[in-house]
Curated annotation (Swiss-Prot):
Organism the protein comes from: Ajellomyces dermatitidis (Blastomyces dermatitidis)
Family: Belongs to the chitin synthase family. Class I subfamily.
Subcellular location: Cell membrane
EC nos: 2.4.1.16
Catalytic activity reported: [(1->4)-N-acetyl-beta-D-glucosaminyl](n) + UDP-N-acetyl-alpha-D-glucosamine = [(1->4)-N-acetyl-beta-D-glucosaminyl](n+1) + UDP + H(+)
GO biological process terms held by the UniProt record: cell wall organization; chitin biosynthetic process
Enzyme class: transferase
Gene Ontology MF, one: chitin synthase activity
One of the record's GO cellular component terms: cell septum
Name the record gives this protein: Chitin synthase 1
Annotated coiled-coil segments of the chain: none
Length: 188
């Protein structure tokens, strides 16, 4: 559920960038400039529902990963796919559906061992950063749902200020309508 919520937000951001037809950088083919990298910390630890969502998107195949190849320990398993499958949430259920229009390029790195979040960040920058050579990177934890244009605005901060080394967005609690009034700290 948390992973799907994050991915839905990321997919909507990619759609938004593709809708910016008057942009010199973005527009109809913007999806070709964006790669969604998912790094999961430990094959034994990955959430089964997350694995199912990744398999449904086409970027993961269960049963292929091995602990060793030719007697040597495997560090990570890397899957790559350009998906045209979308998702929607109905309660806590994830429903996959065909996407109309915007494909999403995905890389999924399933680390063999659980080595914590900082190691996953290092994997992302050292393994994929060198190959992809991105202009910017946006790191999101599973469960964080970006607004439909928030990744664009982060990119824009870097584009307008090329000497900028980092930027962060705002995180709001996701509460159902009227729940904010129950807790006076949240309501304030």
């Amino acid at each position: 559920f948390l992973f799907a919520r994050t991915m839905i937000g990321v997919f909507k951001n990619i759609e938004y960038m593709c809708s910016r037809t008057n942009s010199k950088t973005w527009g109809k083919e913007a999806w070709k400039k964006i790669v969604v990298c998912v790094v999961s910390d430990g094959r034994a630890k990955i959430n089964q529902r997350t694995k199912a969502v990744l398999a449904g998107l086409g970027v993961y195949q269960d049963g292929i990963a091995k602990q060793q190849v030719n007697g040597k320990d495997v560090t990570a398993h890397i899957y790559e796919y350009t998906t045209q499958i979308g998702m929607e949430l109905k309660g806590t259920q994830v429903h996959l559906k065909p996407r109309s229009g915007v494909p999403v390029q995905m890389i999924f790195c399933l680390k063999e061992k659980n080595q914590k979040k900082i190691n996953s960040h290092r994997w992302f920058f050292q393994a994929f950063g060198r190959v992809l050579d991105p202009n910017i990177c946006v790191l999101l934890d599973a469960g964080t749902k970006p607004g439909r244009d928030s990744i664009y605005h982060l990119w824009r901060a870097f584009d307008l200020h090329p000497m900028c080394g980092g930027a962060c967005g705002e995180i709001k609690t996701m509460l159902s309508h009227g729940k904010k009034l129950i807790n006076p700290l949240v309501a304030a």
